[in-house]
Design a protein with these regions (language model features):
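N-terminal active-site segment of His-dependent metallophosphoesterases
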Residues: 1-54, 64-65, 73-75, 147-148, ...
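Short amphipathic alpha-helices and their capping/turn segments at secondary-structure boundaries
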Residues: 23-26, 80-101, 134-149
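Conserved beta-sheet core of the metallophosphoesterase superfamily
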Residues: 46, 54-58, 82, 86, ...
Length: 240
C-alpha cells in the first residue's frame, strides 16, 4: 500500500500516533513525505530514522539542500531518485514516478517566509525554490505522459488553492506557487478529463477540499484506481 503524510521536521520522537503507525508498515508498503522531512537537516539525523517501510521524500523549504544535492542518484520507479540512506529516497522535482502502476508527479519546494531570520547554507537554502530548468523538465515529463497523472505531490499548492483554503491575512508571493498554478493549468488544458489528486503539506494544517488534501501529521492511504480516479482514506490512529 502507498501511504502519504505531511511535514515531519524530524520530530517523530515528540509524537505518539504517527510513529506507532509507521512501525506497523513493512517493506511491501511505501511511505511518501510531502517535504520538510527534517531527517536530512543534519547528516547524523538520518541515523535516527529507522523504519522498515521504504520512505520517499518530496523537497520542502526547511530541508538541507547541500545534503540533498550531494546524495547519489539511482534509477527507481521509472525515474531518478536521490539515495539519502538505504530505504530513504528523494523524489526529484519535475519527475514522474510509477508507484504500483500509478503515475505520481512531483513538484517540491516552497518559499521560507522566515528566511530573513535564517543563515544561508546553514539554516536556509535558496534551492528551496524550483528553478526554470525544474519547471521545464516538469513540462517535458508531463507532455511525455500525455498530461495523464494520478497524483500531483508537492510541498505547497497553487496560489489559487492557498487563497481559497487558508485565507491568510498577509500576501507573500511564492514563485513555487506560481509555477504550480501554471502546471495545473497546462495539465487541465491538455487533458480536460484529468482526474488527479493533489496532496501537499507545508501549511501545518489538515484540510481536504475537492481533489486537494493538505496534510500535516496525518497519514492517508491511497486506494485502488477506478474509472472515477483515486480515493484516499485518512488513517485513524491515537493522537497525542
Amino acid at each position: 500500500m502507498i501511504y502519504i503524510t505531511g511535514d515531519m521536521h524530524a520530530s517523530l520522537d515528540r509524537e505518539i500516533g504517527r510513529p506507532r503507525f509507521l512501525e506497523s508498515l513493512t517493506e511491501n508498503d511505501s511511505l511518501i513525505v510531502l517535504g520538510d522531512f527534517g531527517y536530512t537537516w543534519r547528516k547524523e539525523y538520518l541515523n535516527l530514522y529507522n523504519y522498515k517501510v521504504p520512505t520517499f521524500v518530496v523537497d520542502g523549504n526547511h530541508d538541507n539542500y547541500t545534503i540533498l544535492n550531494d546524495s547519489p542518484s539511482t534509477e527507481m520507479l521509472g525515474s531518478e531518485v536521490g539515495v539519502l540512506k538505504e530505504g530513504v529516497y528523494r523524489l526529484k522535482t519535475g519527475n514522474i514516478y510509477n508507484f504500483n502502476g500509478l503515475k505520481v508527479f512531483v513538484f517540491g519546494g516552497a518559499l521560507s517566509i522566515d528566511k530573513a531570520m535564517r543563515t544561508p547554507y546553514v539554516s536556509w537554502w535558496p534551492e528551496e525554490i524550483p528553478t526554470r530548468n525544474d519547471y521545464n523538465r516538469a513540462l517535458e515529463n508531463l507532455e511525455k505522459a500525455n498530461w495523464d497523472i494520478d497524483l500531483f505531490l508537492a510541498h505547497t499548492c497553487s496560489e489559487e488553492v492557498c487563497e481559497r483554503l487558508f485565507h491568510y491575512s498577509y500576501k507573500i508571493t511564492d514563485p513555487t506557487e506560481k509555477m504550480i498554478s501554471q502546471l495545473e493549468f497546462e495539465i487541465n488544458y491538455h487533458n480536460p478529463k484529468a482526474k488527479y489528486l493533489f496532496l501537499f503539506g507545508h501549511h501545518h494544517n489538515f484540510m481536504i477540499f475537492s481533489k486537494y488534501a493538505c496534510l500535516y501529521s496525518e497519514v492517508v492511504k491511497v486506494g485502488e484506481k477506478t474509472n472515477e480516479g483515486l480515493k484516499i482514506e485518512v488513517v485513524r490512529y491515537p493522537q497525542g
